[in-house]
A protein has these predicted regions:
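Intrinsic disorder/low-structure terminal segments
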Residues: 2-5, 20, 43, 249
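Channel- or pocket-lining gating/hinge segments that regulate access to a cavity or pore
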Residues: 207-209
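Feature captures the catalytic cores and cofactor-binding loops of soluble hydro-lyases/lyases
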Residues: 29-197, 211-253
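Bacterial Sec-dependent signal peptides at the C-terminal "C-region" and cleavage site
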Residues: 15-33
Length: 253
């Protein structure tokens, strides 16, 4: 249970004795456009990255959370299915303006509304995986956001657009002349976690979690169970003024 949620839940609103516990669900920021007719995406939008992180480990026995340097650079919460692109170092002749970002541009131009673009720049945090032109296209395609194992540039413009972007670094340096994409919609290692096309990414201020698509229903059910237990802990803590007793009773922290 995160301190953010405890603090939010312990605040009592001066309105007819109604506590913040009653409005926790309403206070959560939306996670971006939903893929039409995808109940799993809708379900994950009602939970938190922290709960989903715990749930992935419980269900799969493996970590699904990207490294802590995968930071929210722009936008807000994000949930969506992944589309992927991989870039590697390349000679200048093979890293032209077209080839440097070929597959990354393709996953954006082919994206369905609500999808999340995942771009991996193998071996560097000093070269930008995308800038404002690619971000503009992502917004126009209705993408939920982007996750970059690499750097981002043109932050001044991307923040203005409102596109959600997570990245490991910022750098103004171009990929042209240095890197070229080699494949799209393949499994990639992003932030220390394998991401496959169709996996569900759940991200908020805490970080980015990858939900394996074949276990998504189980993970969602577990995450909802975690949130339900935590919801019961808030009034217990207020009543008994003891976090230790709440942990013992609900077996949750």
């Amino acid at each position: 249970m995160t301190l953010r949620r405890v603090a939010r839940a312990l605040i009592v609103l001066p309105l007819a004795g109604i506590s913040a516990f009653a409005v926790i669900g309403a206070a959560q920021a939306p996670a971006g456009p939903a893929a039409a007719g995808d109940p799993l995406i809708a379900g994950f939008k009602s939970t938190y990255a922290a709960s989903v992180s715990d749930a992935v480990e419980i269900v799969t026995g493996k970590n699904g959370t990207m490294r802590s340097d995968m930071k929210l650079m722009a936008g807000t919460n994000m949930v969506g299915r992944a589309v992927t692109s991989l870039a590697k170092p390349a000679p200048a002749a093979q890293a032209t303006a077209t080839l440097a970002v070929k597959h990354s541009v393709e996953i954006i131009d082919e994206a369905k509304p609500g999808e999340v673009g995942v771009i991996v720049m193998e071996g560097t945090l000093d070269i930008a995986a995308m800038g404002n032109l690619m971000a503009t296209a992502a917004v126009e395609r209705g993408m939920a956001g982007m996750v970059l194992d690499g750097a981002i540039r043109d932050m001044w413009d991307i923040r203005r657009m409102g596109l959600t972007v997570y990245a490991r670094a910022k750098s103004p340096r171009t990929a042209v002349g240095h890197y070229a994409t080699v494949a799209k919609n393949i499994p990639v290692e992003c932030g220390g976690v394998t991401v496959r096309p169709g996996d569900i990414l759940v991200a908020d201020e805490d970080g980015v979690v990858v939900v394996p698509q074949e276990r998504a229903s189980e993970v969602l059910k577990e995450a909802q169970s975690i949130d339900s237990r935590e919801s019961g802990m808030y009034p217990f803590i207020r009543q008994f003024k003891s976090l230790q007793e709440a942990i013992k009773k609900f077996n949750r922290i």
